[in-house]
A protein has these predicted regions:
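Short hydrophobic/aromatic-rich motifs at helix boundaries and adjacent loops
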Residues: 1-3, 111-113, 198-200, 207-208, ...
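Extreme N-terminal "head/tail" segments of very large remodeling/mechanoenzyme assemblies
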Residues: 3, 7-15
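Amphipathic alpha-helical transducer elements in NTP-driven molecular machines
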Residues: 2-5, 27, 39, 64, ...
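Short, flexible, solvent-exposed loop/turn segments with mixed acidic/basic and small polar residues
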Residues: 4-7, 44, 253-254
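Acidic-enriched and Gly/Ser
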Residues: 11-12, 19-218
Length: 324
């Protein structure tokens, strides 16, 4: 943890103003320590004014007061990308809800944060790259199957320039933290690559050769949509409507029948009842292509309307980053 410590000088709802001495960056993550307890509330810098930073807190701020300390991490809000995302249910900060329930019970405690991906589960890794090859960001080093989907283990997106593959792990089972490849830069630096990548949610991924324009329709198998309101594969569409109009039902139908590899549902600002309905129905929906449960190729991110605004906003960025 960084030694950059700030002091709270004002609290207003889920916003707090923090005074700091050392440099702080926009969108940096910090942890507000609640009174004299060990509870640490995750927050993010949204504005910097001189030596004061306005921060939005992702949890209920009851008990937070002037004089409490804030630990700045020096890192931006980021999500973990790698095998283990499918079939999982996360909150807006990518905490796995089933694991949170096991640890905290029915009532989640503030300040509880878990790793998004299971560190103990082993995945079958198959190398693709060979030692001596030249690679760059987003090049494939190997593959890992998860259900019907195959993950590509890529050169980290943050790297720039050309790298030489020093070594690649042989085919076998590894967890997401084990090193599966070593890359060497032109200046001699060595980069160790694992199956998991951290990527800031508010930084666009630029490691692509070209941006493809949507040219094909996405077949939703809903006649009125495919006939009168066709959706482009790789495009965007909106379902506006009042309460009870069937927005969530249409979302379920699209998720079940659309010709896609992965389904990611972000229940952002939904009523709690609709989120519960989603969690109950998706494991029971059958994938027409495989005959197995749709949940095997689905990731759900839950942030109900009762959650703080900051957490609901973060869930949108989290969902989009995982999708990319």
């Amino acid at each position: 943890m960084s030694e950059n410590i700030g002091t709270i000088v004002g609290v207003n709802g889920n916003l707090m103003t923090v005074q700091f001495d050392q440099p702080v960056t926009q969108n940096e993550v910090g942890y507000a320590r609640l009174g004299g307890t060990e509870t640490r509330l995750k927050s993010e810098v949204i504005r910097i004014r001189g030596n004061n930073a306005d921060m939005q807190v992702y949890e209920d701020t009851a008990g937070l007061k002037v004089g409490d300390k804030v630990e700045f991490t020096g890192n931006l809000l980021a999500v973990e990308l790698g095998p283990g995302l499918l079939g999982q249910v996360f909150d807006g900060l990518q905490n796995p809800l089933p694991e949170l329930a096991e640890q905290c019970g029915f009532f989640l405690q503030r300040g509880t944060y878990l790793k998004a991906l299971d560190r103990t589960k082993k995945w079958a890794f198959t190398p693709v790259a060979k030692p001596g090859e030249t690679v760059e960001a987003a090049d494939t080093l190997g593959t890992v199957p998860e259900g019907i989907f195959t993950h590509r283990i890529m050169v980290p997106f943050r790297l720039t320039g050309k790298y030489t593959v020093e070594s690649v792990a042989p085919a076998g089972e590894y967890n997401v933290e084990q090193v599966i490849a070593k890359l060497k830069a032109a200046n001699g630096d060595t980069v160790e690559v694992t199956m998991v990548q951290l990527w800031p949610v508010k930084v666009p991924i630029r490691a692509y050769a070209e941006r493809l324009r949507p040219t094909e329709p996405l077949v939703t198998k809903v006649r009125i949509i495919d006939t009168f309101f066709p959706v482009a594969r790789g495009g965007v569409y909106c379902i506006p409507g009042p309460f009870g109009a069937g927005k969530t039902v249409l979302q379920h139908i699209t998720s079940k029948n659309a010709d896609v590899d992965i389904v990611l549902v972000a229940a952002c600002g939904e009523r709690a009842g609709e989120v519960v309905e989603t969690l109950r129905e998706f494991p029971e929906l059958i994938d027409p292509r495989t005959g197995r449960t749709l949940m095997e190729r689905t990731t759900i991110i839950c942030n109900t309307s009762s959650m703080p605004v900051a957490a609901r906003e973060a869930s949108v960025y989290t969902a989009v980053t995982i999708c990319e």
